[in-house]
């Protein structure tokens, strides 16, 4: 394929032509598309054929300046797009694009002179701009202008009263199209009246420049100019571009790597054929009357439409706007659905049972018009209400208006109109204004699915429209496949509705007829995805989501059996075809889910069919009911044992344990099947329980076989067949369909499957012939066709075919039906079992065996075709359509599959045809006499070459296909797909690896079968000769395939080894050349043999070596770090040329061999050992063969060329010798000059100038590589001379005595300049030019540094000289020394340069003389040889330049990578610094926290020490208290009896007597019991807690222990203000555990301890109770031993009588 252009501007819009070779055939009925694939965008455009092999298209605009791949794709009906050829086009940024961008960016900064300054960068004049007028408009149109941009600049800027605009600029230039373009942009009208800085408007400027025609055009321009470019954004990644001038449509998609080319082309075709959408989307805004409505009536004129549009109300217009916005949303969702075809499934699964109110009105209307009735039911509360909102969701259009049927697909509605009598009015009468508005808007916004279904693929009853319609059907035959889901799973084609003129009768009334309701309903039939239900574009006037879904979902029922037992509902593949009669109307049928069936009683209330129909349906329903009752679980158990044997005979099922992917039901009991308890019939695919198999109905296998033999092969689902008008028949499932079908297969019953893309042409022709016959029959007798359809429906409903049960959508029905019929013919084991026994007995034994082998050959060939069919239709098609895998990936798994199918199918049909010819009076009995000629024809000439090529490629990629399959199996989705396909009975439990293996093994079966046939064939016959020839051909084919596989495996192994070889490894050859990995990558080198050998070193060790025998060399490699490197053993080269290579055995080693290389560079010998003697011999044999077949060295030299080579080498040696001599002389000159400098330095020191810095070295070093640069030295010398002159003048002004020295200095300077032959003006000019132009860029860095130092020192000296006129002689001497050093260095540099120049001149002279001598002395073949050598040198030079260029590019890339790494390193360094600062701040915070914690820890330790000290004090105090208590206890026991107590009657006092007093008195001891009680009471009142804490005695205990003289206690009133020493002494004597201190005194004991209960712990109960027994014993003893007397006394103070009980001791 050749393209007419290789470059295009960024905005495109130029014609491109693709020319194909003459041998390339372009089908006439195919569509061609141009695709432009860039790095980020893909463009799809349609192409037009202008010649037989030339296609024309337009180049679209592109976003990047890059090279795109242009491909031409062919699309034909039923096939995937095929790439015909490809090329490349480079998008360039031309002058118009650059100028357009400049105008957009400079819109805010225009001045009165901008029309001249803007053209300066482009070197344009005002006269050349008119040629760029249109290109500028296209470039500006292609640019994406900012949102706030206007012609006046940014809208945010204030518009001044005088400013220049882009319109002024365009009018100055006189560009008419650009001016009109700016006028249509925002701000264009304001710019027309805006004066510029000079006060001139754009029109004034145009008149001033002489563009009067432009002024006239702009004056007459009223904004009607339509833009040349329109765009509709379909989604985030897809958009449509329409060029109005060329009328070209482009689909642009971003991120091309995520989309398949086939899906993108389908998306483009979808919108390209949806002309109604294109007209509404891309129609210019200047024509609103054409965009508002699309009238389908030819009677209405354009003015009527305008009037009707203008007469609409505001509410109607607002509704139309809402509908338009709804359609835009719909298109976005629909495009996203087309881009992602993976996520769709049926929403009808969840639909609710519709109301039956609609059925009465609809069915009563429908039953009056036809014999066969199919009803589509949906929820409508009132039949006469037209208030149904327009809904357009995911390609579904719901309408109540019949105008949708007449909607056309053409942009110009006036060109294609319908007849008046068949077209309804555009705006029907309705009382509901909103419904009318929706209907009107809906008329112009038909969805693609509904419009295409009603206009393209149906046979209309309008004869006047057939001519124009046929053209459209031809070009959009596959549109249905686009509207439906293209995945091929779970979806079907949209329903097609036929309309007749009679169906339009009720279109002008307010109440819709059944046809209108049917149009509403059927338009909701096409693909509806629940995955989009969350993002439905619902407007404000739509109903809720629940009512919407229930309204859109359609369900259909057959009047013959409303109770259809079907599983999961899909969109039904069906065809409804119109008959020629106006009264016949067919309605589409869809299958309802089982759980949503309408009950029979409710349905029958509203259906009143004719008598015959009613009786027929009644019988059908009764039969269905009885069958369900008979197969119920209750009756099944009763009849199980009785009818087991009869059922066994009748059923003839072949049950086997089944595997199911989903939830299935039993055919008998309708219960869920479990894996272990389920059985599946291999014939009819019926699923039952193990216990229900006896009650299963009869197998339908035999009925289907009989039907398959008699039925016509008409497949109605093919796209090519849809173009043909069909008779008035409709397909619907019957009620007797078995319930136990799998969910994925139930919907296939009664449906028609579409053809696959691989249907051969003969099958299509047979389909067309059958369709034509059906059409002719329908034209002559419609009743006959209907009766035929009844028989067809009954046969398909009552006895569905085996293939219908087990076949899924991915399988082509026609091909599988042919294969199944062939399988039935060859299902027997041998030929003797196929023919009649009597016929077989009449044949000879050899004939029978020969026929058995021939039958086996045909049978295995048929099985092989089935295997290929499984691979193609079950696995490959599903991968492409369901998994959406890339076609290249699928082709890697199934290489050459279509070619294999074609070859083997042709071979099988040839043998089958020979079988038909060999029938002996009966179809069953046959004897094949000749089979050899078919075998010879199959395996010879063209067929043999095809089979060798195809099988060679298939077998070569066998391992790759299996490995790729295993890699894909890691994906969960792919695993589920394979499991589902393997469970299919068609796959016969064969996976993809098994199928691939069977295909590779097929060709190895032919020799065995042919040899057996040959064994039983008579010799010296033609058949025997053919069989022998065929056997040889088969073996030759197998050998060729085997050779191809071996070569391919060797190449793959060689590539693997090359990939493992280290890139930097190399080895040196004997001739000194370096052999690298790149030298191995030659296409001429192929791998002949390889293996592991052992290289014996000089020390006797063995090295493991990988030996590779190539076509011209023998290579030794070593493995290192999982990489291969050239072997390095004994410093011998590891690459041996096969030229003059000899292999010899080692004398005493049967596993060793010597490899002797007798090359001209030098002989070399290698000792190689192998694992065995056989391997050694094999290596020697293969090396000998390789040496014999080794190609000769390229460019073999003759003796004369060798002599020339020696002469050339001699000349080169001589030149090198001269160069060495010159170099030595230069070095000597440099040494002499340095010696002179050293002498000058010594003289300076001897003269007494010690402060002068003298450097005795030159500023250059003699380098033989590159000559030194002298320009910088010369410049420095001139500067030094100037500084010396300044110093001498300064010294002359300072002292007269120095004049002699000054003159001497000048003479020295002059002598120095003259002695060294400093060049005059040419050198000065050279230095000046060098300084001005290049600076010191070419100067050696060391020289430049030294010269810079000298210049700085000289500058300081000059300043010093100027400041101090009396400069010393040392400064002058320093300047002279520097100047001398520079001049000597300059002299050395010039000498070295002269040497280099002489060497180069000598080399050039030698080359010129050599070429001249060759041209004079030699000619003929030698001259040709020299020219070839020169060409080769030129090529090598070009290669060197190319390598240099690549090196430079690599350096630039490396520099960029370094910069990126530096930036990344800087970023990371800043981040690390920031992180370090954060860490430091956190560390400081932690240190502060640690200090605070340390302080807290110290405080805590101090507190803990204080607590411990207090605890120790408390313990010591407790010990002291316990000691005191013990002392008191001892003291109490010792002193208790000698301490009597007397209670005086005058008050509550207890007197303690001294020991002497107690002895002097009557030894009496008195205890006042009342006093003790009083003390306890007082103590309890003051502080009762102490008593409980101290565990004192209760009063009751004291009462019981003391002896009472009176039963009544006497209450004593004690004054609390007086101290009670008595109680104190008393309780002190009783013990410390029983003390109660007076609470009015200080609460401290004798040791000043606080006794407050809140601070001091009380003694433990044990301590207090320990002394109680002692006190009791003491009192008891006193009671018993001492006499008692009672004493009564009156209390004088209180006057109250009180009794006291006193005990006298």
From Swiss-Prot:
Coiled-coil features, chain-numbered ranges: 1488-1525
An example molecular function term from Gene Ontology annotations: RNA binding
Region Disordered, annotated ranges: 287-316, 473-524, 630-649, 710-800, 1187-1207, 1312-1339, 1638-1705
Database matches in Gene3D superfamilies: 3.30.60.20, Dbl homology (DH) domain (1.20.900.10), Pleckstrin-homology domain (PH domain)/Phosphotyrosine-binding domain (PTB) (2.30.29.30)
Residues of the DH domain: 849-1044
A biological process from GO: regulation of small GTPase mediated signal transduction
Feature: compositional bias, Basic and acidic residues: 640-649, 777-791, 1191-1207, 1641-1655, 1688-1699
Region Mediates cytoplasmic retention and interaction with MAPK8IP1, annotated ranges: 1566-1579
PTMs per UniProt: Phosphorylated on tyrosine upon stimulation of cells by laminin.
Region (Interaction with microtubules), start-end ranges: 1425-1705
Renumbered residue ranges of the record's region RNA-binding: 1496-1527
InterPro entries for the chain: ARHGEF28_PH (IPR037819), C1-like_sf (IPR046349), DBL_dom_sf (IPR035899), DH_dom (IPR000219), PE/DAG-bd (IPR002219), PH-like_dom_sf (IPR011993), PH_16 (IPR041020), PH_domain (IPR001849)
Biased composition regions of type Polar residues, renumbered to the chain: 501-510, 710-721, 759-775, 1656-1669
Transmembrane as UniProt keyword: no
Keywords noted in UniProt: Cell membrane, Coiled coil, Cytoplasm, Differentiation, Guanine-nucleotide releasing factor, Membrane, Metal-binding, Phosphoprotein, RNA-binding, Zinc, Zinc-finger
Disulfide bonds: none
Location of the region described as Interaction with PTK2/FAK1 in the Swiss-Prot/TrEMBL record: 1295-1304
Protein origin, superkingdom: Eukaryota
Oligomer and partners: Homooligomer; forms cytoplasmic aggregates. Forms a complex with MAPK8 and MAPK8IP1. Interacts with RHOA. Interacts with microtubules. Interacts with YWHAE and YWHAH. Interacts with PTK2/FAK1. Interacts with NEFL. Interacts with CTNND2; prevents interaction with RHOA.
Protein function: Functions as a RHOA-specific guanine nucleotide exchange factor regulating signaling pathways downstream of integrins and growth factor receptors. Functions in axonal branching, synapse formation and dendritic morphogenesis. Also functions in focal adhesion formation, cell motility and B-lymphocytes activation. May regulate NEFL expression and aggregation and play a role in apoptosis.
The protein's name: Rho guanine nucleotide exchange factor 28
Gene encoding the protein: ARHGEF28
């Amino acid at each position: 394929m050749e393209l007419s252009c290789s470059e295009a501007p960024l905005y495109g819009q130029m014609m491109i032509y693709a020319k194909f070779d003459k041998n390339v055939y372009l089908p006439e009925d195919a569509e061609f598309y141009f695709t432009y694939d860039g790095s980020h965008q893909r463009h799809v455009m349609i192409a037009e054929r202008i010649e037989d092999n030339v296609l024309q298209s337009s180049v679209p605009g592109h976003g990047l300046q890059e090279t795109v791949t242009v491909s031409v794709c062919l699309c034909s009906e039923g096939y995937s797009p095929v790439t015909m050829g490809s090329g490349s086009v480079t998008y360039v940024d031309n002058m118009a694009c650059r100028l357009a961008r400049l105008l957009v960016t400079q819109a805010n900064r225009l001045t009165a002179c901008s029309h001249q300054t803007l053209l300066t960068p482009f070197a344009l004049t005002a006269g050349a701009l008119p040629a760029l007028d249109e290109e500028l408009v296209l470039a500006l149109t292609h640019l994406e202008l900012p949102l706030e941009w206007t012609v006046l600049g940014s809208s945010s800027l204030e518009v001044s009263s005088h400013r220049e605009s882009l319109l002024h600029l365009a009018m100055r230039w006189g560009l008419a199209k650009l001016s009109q373009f700016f006028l249509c942009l925002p701000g264009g009208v304001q710019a027309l009246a805006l004066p510029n800085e000079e006060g001139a408007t754009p029109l004034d400027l145009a008149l001033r420049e002489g563009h009067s025609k432009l002024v006239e055009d702009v004056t007459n321009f009223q904004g009607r100019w339509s833009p040349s470019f329109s765009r509709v954004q379909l989604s985030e990644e897809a958009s449509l571009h329409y060029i109005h001038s060329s009328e070209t449509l482009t689909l642009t998609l971003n991120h091309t790597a995520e989309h398949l080319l086939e899906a993108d082309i389908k998306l483009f075709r979808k919108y390209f054929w949806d002309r109604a959408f294109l007209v509404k989307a891309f129609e210019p805004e200047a024509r609103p009357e054409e965009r508002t409505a699309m009238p389908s009536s030819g009677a209405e004129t354009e003015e009527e439409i305008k009037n009707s549009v203008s007469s609409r109300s505001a509410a109607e217009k607002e509704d139309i706007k809402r509908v338009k916005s709804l359609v835009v949303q719909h298109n976005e969702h629909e495009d996203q659905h087309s881009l992602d075809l993976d996520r769709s499934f049926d929403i009808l699964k969840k639909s609710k049972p519709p109301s039956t109110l609609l059925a009465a009105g609809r069915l009563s209307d429908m039953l009056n018009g036809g014999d066969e009735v199919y009803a589509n039911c949906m929820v409508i509360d009132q039949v006469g209400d037209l208030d149904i909102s327009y809904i357009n969701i995911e390609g579904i259009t719901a309408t109540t208006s019949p105008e949708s049927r007449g909607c056309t697909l053409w942009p110009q509605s006036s060109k294609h109109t319908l007849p008046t009598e068949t077209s309804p009015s555009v705006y029907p009468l309705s009382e509901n204004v909103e419904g009318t508005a929706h209907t009107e808007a809906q008329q112009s916004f038909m969805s693609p699915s509904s419009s295409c279904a009603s206009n393209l693929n149906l046979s209309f009853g309008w004869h006047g429209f057939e001519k124009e319609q046929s053209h459209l059907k031809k070009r959009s035959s596959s549109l249905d496949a686009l509207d439906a889901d293209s995945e091929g799973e779970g979806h079907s084609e949209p329903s097609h509705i036929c309309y007749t003129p009679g169906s339009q009768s009720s279109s002008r009334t307010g109440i819709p007829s059944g046809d209108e309701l049917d149009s509403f309903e059927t338009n909701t039939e096409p693909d509806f995805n629940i995955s989009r239900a969350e993002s439905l574009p619902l407007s404000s006037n739509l109903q809720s989501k629940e009512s919407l879904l229930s309204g859109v979902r359609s369900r259909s029922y057959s009047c013959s059996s409303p109770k259809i037992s079907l599983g999961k509902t899909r969109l039904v593949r069906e065809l409804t075809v119109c008959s020629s009669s106006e009264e016949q109307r067919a309605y589409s049928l869809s299958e309802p889910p089982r759980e949503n069936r309408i009950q029979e009683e409710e349905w029958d209330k509203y259906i009143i069919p004719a008598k015959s129909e009613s009786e027929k349906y009644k019988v059908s329903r009764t039969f269905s009911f009885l069958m369900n009752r008979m197969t119920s679980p209750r009756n099944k158990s009763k009849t199980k044992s009785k009818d087991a044997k009869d059922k066994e005979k009748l059923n003839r099922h072949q049950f086997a344990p089944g595997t199911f992917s989903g939830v299935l039901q039993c055919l008998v009991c309708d219960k869920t099947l479990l894996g272990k308890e389920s059985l599946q019939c291999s014939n009819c695919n019926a699923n039952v329980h193990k216990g229900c198999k006896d009650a299963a109905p009869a197998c339908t296998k035999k009925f289907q076989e009989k039907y398959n033999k008699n039925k016509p092969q008409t497949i109605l689902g093919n796209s090519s067949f849809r173009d043909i008008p069909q008779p008035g028949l409709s397909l619907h499932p019957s009620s007797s369909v078995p319930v136990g079908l799998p969910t994925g297969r139930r919907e296939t019953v009664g449906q028609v499957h579409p053809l696959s893309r691989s249907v051969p042409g003969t099958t299509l022709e047979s389909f067309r012939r059958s369709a034509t016959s059906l059409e002719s029959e329908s034209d002559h007798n419609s009743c006959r066709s209907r009766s035929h359809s009844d028989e067809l429906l009954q046969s398909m409903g009552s006895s569905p075919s085996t293939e219908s049960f087990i076949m899924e959508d991915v399988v082509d029905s026609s091909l599988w039906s042919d294969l199944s019929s062939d399988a039935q013919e060859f299902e027997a084991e041998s030929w003797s079992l196929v023919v009649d026994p009597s016929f077989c007995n009449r044949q000879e034994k050899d004939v029978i065996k020969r026929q058995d082998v021939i039958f086996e050959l045909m049978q295995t060939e048929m099985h092989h075709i089935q295997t290929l069919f499984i691979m193609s239709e079950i696995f490959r098609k599903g991968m492409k359509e369901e998994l959406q895998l890339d076609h290249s990936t699928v082709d890697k798994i199934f290489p050459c599959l279509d070619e294999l199918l074609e070859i083997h199918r042709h071979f099988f049909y040839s043998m089958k045809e020979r079988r038909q010819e060999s029938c002996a009076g009966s179809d069953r009995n046959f004897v094949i006499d000749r089979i050899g000629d078919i075998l010879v024809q199959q395996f010879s000439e063209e067929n043999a070459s095809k089979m060798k090529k195809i099988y060679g490629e298939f077998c070569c990629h066998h391992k790759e296909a299996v490995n790729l399959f295993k890699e894909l199996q890691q994906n969960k989705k792919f695993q589920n797909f394979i499991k589902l396909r393997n469970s299919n009975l068609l796959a016969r439990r064969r996976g993809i690896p098994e199928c691939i293996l069977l295909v590779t093994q097929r060709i190895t079966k032919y020799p065995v079968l042919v040899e057996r046939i040959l064994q039983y064939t008579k010799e010296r016959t033609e058949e025997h000769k053919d069989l022998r020839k065929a056997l040889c051909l088969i073996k030759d084919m197998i050998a060729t395939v085997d050779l191809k596989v071996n070569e391919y495996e060797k190449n793959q192994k060689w590539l693997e080894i090359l990939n493992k070889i280290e890139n930097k490894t190399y080895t040196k050859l004997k001739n000194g050349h370096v052999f690298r990995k790149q030298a191995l990558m030659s296409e001429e080198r192929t791998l002949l043999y390889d293996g592991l050998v052992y290289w014996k070193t000089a020390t006797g060790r063995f090295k493991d070596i990988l030996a590779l025998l190539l076509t011209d060399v023998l290579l030794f490699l070593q493995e290192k770090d999982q990489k291969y490197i050239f072997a390095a053993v004994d410093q011998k080269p590891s690459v041996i040329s096969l030229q003059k290579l000899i292999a010899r055995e080692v004398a005493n080693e049967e596993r060793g061999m010597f490899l002797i290389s007798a090359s001209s560079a030098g002989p070399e010998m290698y000792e190689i050992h192998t694992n065995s003697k056989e391997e050694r011999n094999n290596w020697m044999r293969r090396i000998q063969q390789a040496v014999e077949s080794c190609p000769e060295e390229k460019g073999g030299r003759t003796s004369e060329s060798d002599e020339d080579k020696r002469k050339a080498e001699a000349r080169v040696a001589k030149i090198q010798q001269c160069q060495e001599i010159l170099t030595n002389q230069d070095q000597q000159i440099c040494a002499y000059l340095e010696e002179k400098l050293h002498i000058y330095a010594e003289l300076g020191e001897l003269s007494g100038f010690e402060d002068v810095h003298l450097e005795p070295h030159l500023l250059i070093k003699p380098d033989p590589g590159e000559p030194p640069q002298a320009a910088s030295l010369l410049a420095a010398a001139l500067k030094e001379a100037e500084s010396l002159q300044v110093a001498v003048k300064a010294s002359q002004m300072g002292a007269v005595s120095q004049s002699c020295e000054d003159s001497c200095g000048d003479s020295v300077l002059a002598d120095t300049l003259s002695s060294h032959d400093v060049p005059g003006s040419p050198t000065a000019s050279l230095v000046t030019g060098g300084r001005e132009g290049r600076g010191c860029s070419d100067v050696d860095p060391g020289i430049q540094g030294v010269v810079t130092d000298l210049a700085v020192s000289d500058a300081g000296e000059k300043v010093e000289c100027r400041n101090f006129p009396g400069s010393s002689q040392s400064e002058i001497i320093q300047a002279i020394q520097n100047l001398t050093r520079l001049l000597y260095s300059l002299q050395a540099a010039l000498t070295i340069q002269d040497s280099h120049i002489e060497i180069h001149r000598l080399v050039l002279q030698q080359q010129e003389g050599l070429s001249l001598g060759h041209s004079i002395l030699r000619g003929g073949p030698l001259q040709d040889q020299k020219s070839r050598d020169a060409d080769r040198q030129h090529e090598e030079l070009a290669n060197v330049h190319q390598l240099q260029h690549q090196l430079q590019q690599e350096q630039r890339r490396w520099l960029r990578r370094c910069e990126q790494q530096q930036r990344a390193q800087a970023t990371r360094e800043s981040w690390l610094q920031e992180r370090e600062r954060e860490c430091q701040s956190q560390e400081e915070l932690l240190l502060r926290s640690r200090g605070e914690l340390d302080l807290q820890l110290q405080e805590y330790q101090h507190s803990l020490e204080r607590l411990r000290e207090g605890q120790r004090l408390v313990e010591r105090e407790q010990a002291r208290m316990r000691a005191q208590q013990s002392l008191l206890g001892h003291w109490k026991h010792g002193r208790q009896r000698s301490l009597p107590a007397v209670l005086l009657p005058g008050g509550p006092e207890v007197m303690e007597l001294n020991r002497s007093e107690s002895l002097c008195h009557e030894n009496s001891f008195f205890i006042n019991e009342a006093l003790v009680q009083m003390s306890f009471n007082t103590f309890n009142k003051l502080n009762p807690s102490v008593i409980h804490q101290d565990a004192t005695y209760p009063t009751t205990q004291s009462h019981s222990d003391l002896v009472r003289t009176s039963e009544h206690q006497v209450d004593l009133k004690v004054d609390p203000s007086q101290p009670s020493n008595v109680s104190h002494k008393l309780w002190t004597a009783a013990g410390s555990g029983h003390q109660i201190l007076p609470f009015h005194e200080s609460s401290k004991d004798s040791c000043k301890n606080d006794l407050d209960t809140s601070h001091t712990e009380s003694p433990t109960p044990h301590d207090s109770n320990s002394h109680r027994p002692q006190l009791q014993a003491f009192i008891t003893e006193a009671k018993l031993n001492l006499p008692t007397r009672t004493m009564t006394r009156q209390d004088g103070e209180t006057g109250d009588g009180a009794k006291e009980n006193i005990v006298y001791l």
